[in-house]
């Protein structure tokens, strides 16, 4: 599946004039609060459009944070870093990629899309399967899915910028409502 998606993205790339890359990078850079990698461990997932293999970027990858995020969110034509082309990291396994937290004692999974997946259940790519795997390996896992107010505010078009303020407010309110529960989780 990832290889087919990558091939389709590469076809779009071949038909484009290349200007989308510069615009996409500028868009991503403008939306990040900082263009420097955090000191804490942050893993950003993309999929190599040529091979279909997942790639995980971190501060030691030699890739700018803006480029890693742009590659991870590339939907349509792939995003180029050097000679490589990448597509959305959600195609790796799921938009959460929670399985990358294997080995940690406590894992907090934020699932803004509510754990939805288009993959068949038997593929084991759904969020529930990843959470089960983490727990089987000894992790304590808490998963936060959007509540109904957050889902309504977020809407169905992930790229609609008009939903950002109401979605942020709804997410903030949900976070405040969950604060005590999450405090207990981290104790």
Where do the model's predicted regions map?
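Patatin-like phospholipase
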Residues: 1-187
């Amino acid at each position: 599946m990832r290889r087919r998606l990558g091939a389709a993205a590469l076809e779009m790339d071949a038909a484009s004039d290349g200007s989308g890359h510069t615009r996409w990078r500028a868009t991503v850079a403008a939306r990040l609060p900082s263009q420097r990698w955090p000191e804490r461990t942050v893993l950003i997932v993309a999929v190599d459009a040529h091979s279909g293999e997942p790639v995980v970027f971190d501060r030691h990858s030699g890739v700018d944070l803006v480029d890693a995020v742009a590659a991870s969110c590339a939907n349509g034509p792939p995003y180029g870093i050097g000679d490589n082309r990448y597509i959305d990291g959600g195609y790796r396994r799921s938009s959460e990629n929670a399985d990358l937290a294997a080995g940690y004692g406590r894992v907090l999974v934020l699932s803004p899309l509510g754990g939805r997946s288009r993959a068949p259940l038997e593929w084991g790519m759904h969020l529930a399967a990843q959470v089960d795997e983490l727990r089987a390996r000894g992790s304590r896992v808490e998963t936060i899915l959007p509540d109904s107010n957050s889902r309504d505010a977020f809407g169905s078009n992930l790229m609609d910028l008009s939903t950002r303020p109401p979605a942020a407010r709804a997410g903030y309110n949900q976070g405040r409502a969950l604060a005590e529960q999450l405090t207990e989780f981290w104790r």
